[in-house]
Design a protein with these regions (language model features):
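Secondary-structure edge/capping motif, primarily at the C-terminal ends of alpha-helices
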Residues: 38-45
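DNA-recognition element of transcription regulators
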Residues: 161, 210-211
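Walker B catalytic acidic pair
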Residues: 189-191
């Protein structure tokens, strides 16, 4: 399993979500613009005069994003570990938020993180110009999942990896409910086929509340979904619904 690439707008508390989305939109805009500057600088070297300004602005916003993510990931991993323990009590799920290597403490104040980002990007200016791309920043953040202290992507079975992913999904959903008082719509695409019956039953019981859409390819599993509407799709055509 590849590391879980971090989405820019986590399901963090509502006010923080609004601020995070605003920051993420601005960061993405700056990132796209700076990428164009680097890409086109070979034909128009004068564009590089803007490199410093965009790098400083990205560092300022990126520091705030990193700090948001660090706090949210800590909360998410704690909740996900509890979910995973209910599914597989003999294994321990943990994780590491991976951001720019120069950031020594993602929980530090934003000014400290910003300075570390600035130092990092300026030390890589020549490399960025040669690569024609932005080489570091929160756009490359990851969440590495660990099982019993070892990388799930490298050492976990398919079932373990799928259970890790489900644990994160269910934890995000529960954190959202704790904050907003309602569950978000949950979409699960063929996630049950690689789980044994005990884990299938656990997942289905865990998602009994709220709106959920599940796809599956096995009739045996679909029988367990009779609490909701079930319909079949074959050759792009949807059959009559059953309950």
């Amino acid at each position: 399993m590849p590391e879980r690439r971090l989405a820019a707008d986590f399901s963090i508390p509502r006010c923080a979500r609004c601020a995070q989305r605003t920051l993420s939109r601005e960061y993405n805009r700056l990132h796209e613009h700076k990428t164009r500057i680097l890409r086109d600088s070979e034909e128009k070297p004068s564009l590089l005069s803007m490199w410093e300004d965009f790098s400083l602005r990205m560092a300022h916003i990126g520091a705030q994003i990193i700090r948001y993510r660090a706090y949210y990931c800590r909360k998410l991993l704690k909740a996900a570990a509890a979910v995973y323990a209910d599914i597989a009590p003999h294994e321990v799920l943990s994780g590491v938020y991976k951001t720019v290597s120069s950031v020594t403490d993602p929980f530090a104040d934003a000014r400290t993180i910003e300075k570390q980002l600035i130092d990092h990007v300026f030390s890589h200016k020549t490399a960025e110009i040669a690569a024609k791309s932005c080489l570091s920043g929160p756009h490359k953040d990851d969440l590495e999942l660990l099982l019993d202290g070892r990388s799930a992507s490298s050492f976990g079975s398919q079932g373990q990896v799928r259970t890790c992913t489900l644990s994160l999904k269910l934890a995000e959903r529960e954190l959202f409910f704790d904050e907003d008082g309602e569950y978000p719509v949950l979409l699960l695409d063929d996630v049950l086929s690689e789980l044994d019956r005990r884990r299938q039953d656990f997942v289905l019981n865990r998602i009994s509340a709220g709106q959920v859409m599940i796809t599956c390819c096995e009739d045996g599993i679909s029988e367990k979904l009779r609490a909701g509407a079930v319909f079949h799709i074959q050759n792009g055509e949807k059959s009559a619904e059953t309950h």
